[in-house]
Regions:
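Alpha-helical transmembrane segments of multi-pass membrane transport proteins
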Residues: 1-351
């Protein structure tokens, strides 16, 4: 859970890539495209690690009951509107139809519509079911599943008022959450640009670039040094703070070394992921430990026994194999830069 939760800052849409692009002046669309293939590879390595570990130690992943294909298909149908919305938002950016800001506005509007429709008796599912039933070639099982969705929630007394109150609460929480996130991003950007201006005014960035150039490092050597630097920094510093305080200094260094900033951005975001699960300061580790404690306490109360939650050291040890997966993917991206830059070059043209 801790490692999988970090995938969100690599697989688009990603706040981490947006912040990186704004700080270094890189195209958000190119960064989103660049993060797709490494993100999928990282997710696959996580799945392989889980599969191998569960074969070696079967007790860590007990087998669940088999789920019928009918239920699997029902789950896919319920995800169809969300999937189409994600495809529309990212696709409009990738194909140059809309800017990231325009696509974000369209995505918010679509998500709001789906949320309100879902709280109004699953209107979206009913519409999909009505359209699909017009095609006689579909299997009867498909139509049956969709009919089940339409009749799953009959209207009960007081349900309309409850749905209206629920919608109002959803809108309220959405607006507050958006305001908090937007304020956080704007404060980070304000601090980053202020720091960048201050470093430029006192020539710290220029002096740093000249100091690094004096070592006559190759591009590969420079990247490896930066990887080690960020791995060490991530053990005692929060990930976004790490990016905020170092990028303004590194931009001239990367420019002098002719480093592709899209390629380096993907490497850096994976390093930010590693920082989130790096002992002893990884934020995701403490979130997971808190969730473990709450879950164990609720389970113990249900069974009438004392809770026996493991220590944070168990979480530290548990994430080590997944950090190894991140190191493998970083190595692949360094060895094969095309993993990050091929897709944006194909979609938007090389530079």
């Amino acid at each position: 859970l801790a490692a999988g939760g970090t995938l969100g800052i690599l697989i688009p849409p990603s706040i981490g890539l947006v912040l990186y692009g704004l700080i270094v002046g890189e195209s958000i669309g190119r960064l989103f495209l660049a993060g797709f293939i490494p993100g999928v590879i990282l997710a696959i390595t996580f799945m392989l690690m889980i599969g191998i570990a569960s074969k070696i130690w079967p007790g860590i992943a007990p087998k669940e009951e088999m789920v019928t294909w009918r239920l699997r298909f029902a789950g896919l149908v319920s995800l169809l509107p969300i999937g189409l919305l994600i495809f529309a938002v990212l696709g409009s950016i990738y194909f140059g139809i809309a800017t990231p800001t325009e696509a974000a506005a369209a995505g918010v509007t679509g998500a709001l519509f789906l949320t309100l429709a879902g709280n109004s008796g699953m209107l979206a599912i009913s519409l999909v079911a009505g359209l699909v039933r017009r095609f006689p070639l579909l299997p009867r099982a498909v139509k049956t599943v969709l009919d089940d969705f339409r009749s799953a929630r009959p209207v009960l007394p007081g349900q309309v008022r409850h749905n209206v109150n629920s919608m109002v609460n959803i809108l309220k929480e959405s607006f507050l959450s958006t305001a908090r996130t937007s304020a956080m991003i704007l404060l980070i950007l304000m601090a980053a640009f202020t720091l960048q201006f201050a470093f430029a005014a006192v020539r710290i960035s220029v002096d740093m670039a000249e100091w690094v150039a004096a070592f006559e490092l190759t591009q590969l050597q420079l990247i490896l040094v930066l990887v080690v630097f960020y791995l060490v920094l991530g053990t005692f510093m929060e990930s976004y703070s790490m990016m905020l305080t170092t990028l303004p200094i590194l931009i001239p260094v990367l420019n002098d070394a002719n480093v592709d900033k899209v390629w380096f951005g993907i490497i850096m975001v994976i390093l930010l992921e590693a920082a989130q699960i790096s002992p002893p300061q990884g934020m995701a580790l403490y979130v997971l430990q808190g969730a473990r404690r709450d879950t164990d306490r609720e389970l113990a109360e249900y069974e009438g026994v004392l809770a026996n939650t493991g220590t944070i050291n168990d979480v530290f040890m548990g994430v080590m194999p997944f950090m190894l997966c991140m190191f493998v993917v970083i190595g692949l991206v360094i060895a094969f830069p095309e993993l990050a830059i091929w897709l944006p070059d194909q979609a938007k043209g090389g530079r």
